[in-house]
A protein has these predicted regions:
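Sensory-domain boundary capping and coupling elements
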Residues: 121-135
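Intrinsically disordered, low-complexity terminal regulatory regions
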Residues: 1-68, 72, 151, 156
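Regulatory sensory and allosteric helical modules in signal-transduction proteins
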Residues: 58-108
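Juxtadomain coupling helices with adjacent low-complexity linkers
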Residues: 24, 134-157
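Short loop/turn motifs at secondary-structure junctions and domain boundaries
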Residues: 47, 107-112
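A short, aliphatic-rich beta-strand micro-motif
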Residues: 114-122
């Protein structure tokens, strides 16, 4: 059963806390990873109005475009390339205040100015996907985003 997204105004942490609860409720009885990624990307995107919110799935030695919200996207990213590939390789969240300063950044859109990429791992610790969020503003993402997005991605195991 679909739930209506209910995120009222408030600060960033308050929005994330409410978003976390709603995603937890929505995903608790759904076992399909793509369905959960699709709903999570829509909920995150519409709560914060980010430029682009996408999941890339690990397929072999590439990240392959998965559920997303926003403009057209790069379809495939190699292991270790760009912000997404680096998050996968290093198995840790990447917070990039200015994408132009990130060595090897892959410019899917010139509108993207800052980015956060959060790896998603399975029960064995293997990276299965990454959540990539872009903003058209510099310095959009901070430790609050990192902490809450890591918690949200943890719901999708």
């Amino acid at each position: 059963m679909a739930e209506e997204l209910q995120i009222a105004g408030g600060g960033k942490e308050e929005k994330y806390a409410l978003l976390y609860k709603q995603i937890a409720t929505l995903t608790e009885n759904e076992s399909d990873a793509i369905a959960n990624m699709a709903n999570a990307s829509a909920m995150i995107h519409h709560t914060f109005g980010f430029w682009w919110t996408v999941f890339y799935r690990v397929v072999g030695d590439e990240l392959v475009l998965g559920p997303f919200q926003g403009p057209l996207a790069c379809s495939r990213i190699k292991y270790g390339r760009g912000v997404c590939g680096t998050a996968w390789k290093e198995q840790r969240t990447q917070v990039v205040p200015d994408v132009e300063q990130f060595p090897g950044h892959i410019a899917c859109s010139s509108a993207s100015k800052s980015e956060i990429v959060v790896p998603l791992s399975d029960a064995d610790g293997n990276i299965t996907a990454v959540l990539d969020i872009d903003s058209e503003h510099y310095n959009t993402f901070d430790d609050v985003d990192r902490l809450w997005l890591e918690k949200i991605v943890g719901l999708l195991k």
